[in-house]
A protein has these predicted regions:
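PGST-rich, cysteine-poor low-complexity/disordered linker and tail segments that act as flexible spacers
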Residues: 17-20, 40, 50, 71, ...
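Boundary/junction segments of secreted and surface-exposed precursor proteins
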Residues: 13-37
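A short, hydrophobic C-terminal helix/tail in secreted or cell-surface proteins
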Residues: 187-206
Length: 212
């Protein structure tokens, strides 16, 4: 029975959320030697955005960005998922919160991977095109959003007005490094009941064979 319960635990653990979109390479690789600024008004006041597409509806659990901090303050980045408005970011759909601290960009890895969590109904997205928008509200903080694996190209947008909703300049440039993860599926109560009942039956049969 212990073996069967172990199988149940393993099967649940394996039901992790899917990768919905990524510009990272094998082993979450990215270009840590180049990137675009995400900074406050005492620098360039740059807001940087990358487009992504969902082939079907999904719930976002988090986004992972490759970010590094330039010398100065190290205020958290605010990350948004925005609608697509004719090839540039549109209205804010969801707000994601930074988890942890951004490492120095000059550490030999361009900083590192930083997780931004999404929670609530806002994270349920329909199929379609969206934008991931990184905004730094602290005037004295400058972050660098590293480039994607092998500097692959895609739709990227910028503005130097410090506004997460534009106006935008957009083009087909080297993308930034990021990944969007889906939420883990939650089994229906009925499915869990059937599974557990099946395990109990299998365990009873095994016990009978061992005692025979």
């Amino acid at each position: 029975m212990a073996i069967l319960m172990g199988a149940l635990i393993c099967s649940v653990s394996a039901a992790a959320g899917d990768i919905l979109y990524t510009t990272l390479g094998p082993g979450s690789a990215y270009d840590g030697t180049n990137g675009y600024f995400v900074d406050g008004s005492n620098y360039y006041d740059t807001v940087t955005a990358d487009s992504f597409t969902l082939g079907s509806g999904a719930t976002v659990a988090n986004a992972v960005l490759a970010l590094g901090n330039s010398p100065g303050n190290n205020n958290p980045v605010t990350l948004y998922i925005e609608s697509n408005n004719g090839g540039v970011p549109g209205s804010i759909t969801a707000t994601l919160s930074q988890v942890g601290t951004i490492l120095p960009w000059g550490n030999g890895s361009g900083g590192g991977l930083v997780t931004f969590s999404c929670s609530g109904a806002q994270c349920a997205l329909a199929a379609g095109s969206y934008w991931l928008v990184a905004w730094e509200q602290d005037p004295n903080t400058q972050q660098v959003w590293d480039l994607a694996y092998q500097d692959q190209s895609g739709n990227v947008a910028f503005n130097s007005s410090g506004s997460p909703t534009g106006p935008w300049m957009a083009g087909f440039y080297s993308e930034n490094a990021f990944q969007i993860d889906g939420a883990s599926p939650i089994p229906e109560p009925g499915a869990l009941l059937v599974l557990f009942s099946g395990l109990l039956s299998a365990g009873y049969g095994l016990r009978r064979r061992l005692l025979a």
